[in-house]
């Protein structure tokens, strides 16, 4: 597969060995990149995870058939329209999109439920960086990452869960050190 996404995702996916082309936010450059993928890299179909109208427009004008959720009025631009699943975790939501796209394209999904391990491969430098950070900040082996970083509204409700601080005490009581990445808001 070839991946297209925000620049930060490139390093996250580096261990998978897949082609990655960044979307920079410069429409003409991004469109040129998508058209190149369509014409020269065998990218005939695109699975759109983000909910943005912009990604659907980019793939439509880039001449790549796309499958994705019918959010944000994207249904007119999608080749394969996938209805929003019932309320679920984002991992399950994105799995639903991929699962339904594979079926719509005539394939058979490898799993019908989200596997316990997503199979994301890390590079040695990722493992070394994590080890260095854990040593630098004295992070114990048992920890939980709390990252209340979502911003904005989804269906009229704040996307950032307001009770992250309430988790700190109970986690520590069972021997798990919370590592909190604060929200900038």
Regions found by a protein language model. Give the residues of each.
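Catalytic machinery of carbohydrate-active enzymes
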Residues: 1-185
